Amino acid sequence: MKAGKVCGETRALLQNPVVEFHRIEDNSGGECSTHKHSHKWNGFFIEEGEMEIHVYKNDYELVDKTILYAGDFMAVKPGEYHLFKANKDTIAFEIYWPELLSEDIQRRSVGKMNA
């Protein structure tokens, strides 16, 4: 589903109970609201342009600012306020997934190199 936003547009490409995948086009200077997701990680992959992510950390008073360029990826933890803004016209993908997937591996053995 395609939807307009104040800073561009977003299109949900996949939405189900376990993952969401959105394509966003943000105009240079566009900035989203400061917000948080209670249970979902929020990942950003930049296809084209430049996007600045501000993360308001829960563990300390500083705001982490990361500038992403084409090919870069970063993720914001659940419960952390954040915003993104386009420093240039930007095409990006947002990926959302729940915290419960983080520790979903149970190892029965240890990896090794066979001769």
Language-model segments: what does each one mean?
Residues 1-23, 31-34, 65-66, 70, ...:
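A short, N-terminal "cap"/entry segment at the start of jelly-roll beta-barrel domains
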Residues 32-34, 44, 53-54, 75-76, ...:
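Short beta-strand His + acidic residue motifs that chelate non-heme Fe in jelly-roll/DSBH
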Residues 29, 48, 89:
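ATP/adenylate-binding site constellation spanning eukaryotic-like Ser/Thr protein kinases
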Residues 57-79:
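Short acidic-glycine-tyrosine-enriched beta hairpin
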Residues 3-4, 83-115:
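Double-stranded beta-helix
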Residues 39-58:
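Glycine- and acidic-residue-biased ligand/ion/polar-headgroup-sensing regions
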Residues 24-44:
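Short, well-structured hydrophobic secondary-structure segments
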